[in-house]
Swiss-Prot record:
It catalyses: oxidized coenzyme F420-0 + GTP + L-glutamate = oxidized coenzyme F420-1 + GDP + phosphate + H(+); oxidized coenzyme F420-1 + GTP + L-glutamate = oxidized coenzyme F420-2 + GDP + phosphate + H(+). Belongs to the CofE family. The lineage of its organism: Archaea, Methanobacteriati, Methanobacteriota, Stenosarchaea group, Halobacteria. Binds 2 divalent metal cations per subunit. The ions could be magnesium and/or manganese. Monovalent cation. The ion could be potassium. This is Coenzyme F420:L-glutamate ligase. Its EC number is 6.3.2.31, 6.3.2.34.
Length: 257
């Protein structure tokens, strides 16, 4: 398997055709997996926002004040409001805001980016990353006559470990996971619980070569990845009612009476 960055992608602006930009910079193949940073998808969709466009609610004011008190970190109430607007549910309000986006991703600050956003204060995540992955895949087929798989990616922190890693927000052309259950290990024991989050692992591999900051590039290609003869699943996010961690967070508060 080979993973390489797509170099030379220009600064993306609202209305740009992401698929066309990628095809111009990379000789793509049918079996490739194209990993595209959510930032350029959002830029192309005009998801940049100004803080001045947000009028903070009472809840946003309270959350911002609580974060400032607990974390000794100034939090603009308008930023808190932007996060609330992008969340279906807020699980933690302080010392940071952890929420469930409207497409099911759980992340800090609703994944809102404040870096590399020319002409705006904030960059929101795509509204429907899977639909965007499908559109990019269709566009690549239209422009280049090939049909690789596409993953829209982001970087995200994780509990219990330091550091960020690449994750999949949306995907098209491949299953989210592959199921090893029913197969056997080297000692002949049947595997009972091994479901591999393929799209997340590919997103993380892509993140190793795309980099961060002003030296980064917003796309990478995974070539010669073999999914194998396994059952696949489109489900990546846990069922909220069976997610023990989510249920615990719903009951937990940093602020004690």
């Amino acid at each position: 398997m080979e993973v390489f960055a797509v170099e030379g992608v220009p600064e993306v602006r609202p209305g740009d055709d992401v698929a066309e930009l990628l095809v111009e910079q990379a000789d793509l193949q049918d079996d490739d997996v194209v990993c595209v940073a959510s930032t350029i998808v959002s830029k192309a969709n005009g998801r940049g926002r100004s803080l001045s466009s947000y009028e903070p609610s009472g809840r946003a004011e309270r959350i911002a004040a609580t974060i400032e008190d607990i974390a000794d970190e100034e939090k603009d109430p308008r930023m808190a409001q932007a996060i609330l607007d992008e969340c279906e549910e807020v699980l933690v309000e302080a010392p940071f805001i952890l929420g469930v986006t409207k497409f099911g991703h759980i992340t800090v600050n609703a994944g809102i980016d404040r870096s590399n956003v020319p002409g705006a204060d904030l960059l929101l995540l795509p509204e429907d990353p899977t639909a965007e992955a499908e559109a990019i895949r269709d566009g690549i087929r239209e422009h280049a006559g090939v049909e690789p798989s596409v993953i829209v990616t982001d970087t995200s922190g994780r509990p219990f470990r330091l550091g960020q890693r690449g994750v999949a927000l949306g995907w098209a052309g491949l299953s989210a996971s592959r199921d090893w259950r029913g197969e056997h290990d080297r000692d002949g024991r049947e595997l009972e619980a091994t479901v591999q989050a393929v799209v997340d692992e590919l997103a993380a591999a892509a993140n190793l070569v795309t980099g961060e900051g002003d030296g980064g590039t917003p796309a990478a290609v995974v070539r010669d990845f073999d999914f194998g003869d396994h059952a696949g699943s489109e489900q990546l996010f846990r069922d909220p009612e069976k997610d023990v961690v989510r249920q615990a967070l719903r009951e937990w508060s940093h602020v004690r009476d």
